[in-house]
Amino acid sequence: MGALRWLSIAATASTALALNPEGLISAPRRSEAIPNPSGDVAVFSQSQYSFKTHKTTSQWNVLDLKSGDIKLLTNDSDVSEIVWLGSDDSTVLYVNGTNADIPGGVELWVSDISDFANGYKAASLPASFSGFKVVTTDSGDVRYVAYAESWANGTAYNEELVAKPLSSARIYDSIYVRHWDYYLTTRFNAVFSGTLKKSEGKGKATYKADGDLKNLVSPVKNAESPYPPFGGASDYDLSPDGKWVAFKSKAHDIPRANYTTAYIFLVPHDGSKTAVPINGPDSPGTPEGVKGDAGSPVFSPDSKKIAYWQMADESYEADHRTLYVYTVGSEETIPSLAADWDRSLDSVKWADDDNLIIGVEDAGRSRLFSIPADAGDDYKPKNFTDGGVVSAYYQLPDSTYLVTSTAIWTSWNVYIASPEKGVIKTLATANKIDPELKGLGPEIVDEFYYEGNWTKIQAFVIYPENFDKSKSYPLLYYIHGGPQSSWLDSWSTRWNPKVFADQGYVVVAPNPTGSSGFGDALQDAIQNQWGGYPYEDLVKGWEYVNENFDFIDTDNGVAAGASYGGFMINWIQGSDLGRKFKALVSHDGTFVADAKVSTEELWFMQHEFNGTFWDNRENYRRWDPSAPERILKFSTPMLIIHSDLDYRLPVSEGLSLFNILQERGVPSRFLNFPDENHWVQNKENSLVWHQQVLGWLNKYSGVEESNEDAVSLDDTVIPVVDYNP
């Protein structure tokens, strides 16, 4: 049996303010804190949406790394990126998102943070470039890389300069046809390189563009970097000496929709040679049997090595991520590090030429670990951070790290840590700064473990405003997507458990079979078990809550989930557990087994169900929420959300479910966004999403009556289409 890990403040009343949807969506959103070379200050961006003006404002701030004080650097909304330039503690290169000469282009400006408004233009770029990485060479010149969309001929794509075609037709001879939320074209993402020439003069040196941009990706047919939809600047790196660029691309020589295989390419910064993969099928150092996805290439400080991660399985997107270190120019087999460790890394950086720092998901958190660059496969890395989820980390001159993280109780937390001392000092945290998050703290979260179907399962517990253990609160059962994913101790603007809890629930968020960060065995066991082991874990979790927590009212409980969590809600609707809930919410869940073939990343379904749709159809139908015998059990009121741009799980899945619920006479509602994908990101749409989801749950759980401030379905001003007689 598990035990709830009580925190000292959790059982007492607090003066915390309820976190409501408007506060969540309109609270400031901040980027990682990027330190200057001396480690005195760091810069970060901040954006904030207003429901009064219906606009987003943005700014850049400076964080003092000694005092924690924050001051405004600029509120110019056209400044989209800032990077420190050279070893100077105050000179920065920034991206101006507009271009005075080229519509749709951007400009590079150089400025001093002590007089930011009086910088100068160093370069005019012909398209919308982003993800800048910069090094200063021995000559003083600046070399950089960035990415943009590219035409097939290698020139950068500029949407504002393109003539609209006369026909809207699209023609395909291979897959993908569409991916995530867009239809493929002949364009692709590419990494470009450029140089800023240093000129000495009176006062500070100045920099100006030198030569043309070089497309480093287009010479390799079918290569693309960063790889959409989630690729970004972590997909490539520039060596500290400015001579080399490493980038990730999906394998260019096999069907991209059927395999996860990716290569790390190496190319001179000047593009004088065509990029070659260091881990491709013909590369001399490729480890035997390693054919899966790869990523996060990063050069060592001496530019002689590249660290990266790679999976072995070419059809499993959540396979174990093993760390590798390649020596530039070597033909020896690329060695793996800590390959036997039962955790997958998310990110990697070099501490020095002999040691690395890796970010790793671990037991509901994302932590930092240190590891020697020559570690054997049996090495167990050492953790030096604890709670929350690390989103960025930068080494300071004293070998400590400036860490940016989030937690369930804060959207932004900046602190200093080191492998030797752990967390040393907290500099800033959003719940102490933002009125919208006032009163939030680690006391709002607990966790417990319970016996699942075959192993112990972890679950988070999130308490409502002014929680009182002597009272009773309806259960909100939270089911995550993936399925190889997990609920983390992290902030979310889409599925924030505290917003749900503050309506008047105790949120329980289990990490059942299939969840990541608890070892490969738990994660991998979901294969061909979508409605099996995880469902049984959830049943046992509900039973454990029902038997052990008097302050949780399971009689009036509700459940919600998205993506795989949406599938599970659909599965629960036709299962005995479905009768334990007063209402259900299914967001973008798969419903009809035979419709799985309409997804885009075919490797996913083929791995999850042990074969293709035509060779092993029974496995696809084994866990079919739309099976007739399951439909006959549907009775719990259900809200279905599905959007038109969701090409991962097409909108027809949600419509099919809604049709059946309506014909069966089950209270149901369909919420659709024509301009959203698998996620709801537009701020106004997000508000409607929260109003409808919370309003639906509150209506059937009784929270609407017990909490006068609870969200109601009537809060949404969008008219409801209803042709019932």
Curated annotation (Swiss-Prot):
GO biological processes: proteolysis
EC number of this enzyme: 3.4.14.-
Keywords: Aminopeptidase, Glycoprotein, Hydrolase, Protease, Secreted, Serine protease, Signal
Disulfide bonds: none
Signal peptide: 1-18
Pfam family, one: PD40
Entry GO MF terms: aminopeptidase activity; serine-type endopeptidase activity
Active site: S563, D646, H678
Glycosylation site positions: N75, N96, N153, N258, N383, N453, N610
Family: Belongs to the peptidase S9C family.
Listed PANTHER family: DIPEPTIDYL-PEPTIDASE 5-RELATED (PTHR42776:SF11), SERINE PEPTIDASE S9 FAMILY MEMBER (PTHR42776)
Protein's name in the database: Probable dipeptidyl-peptidase 5
Source species taxonomy: Eukaryota, Fungi, Dikarya, Ascomycota, Pezizomycotina
Recorded name of the encoding gene: dpp5
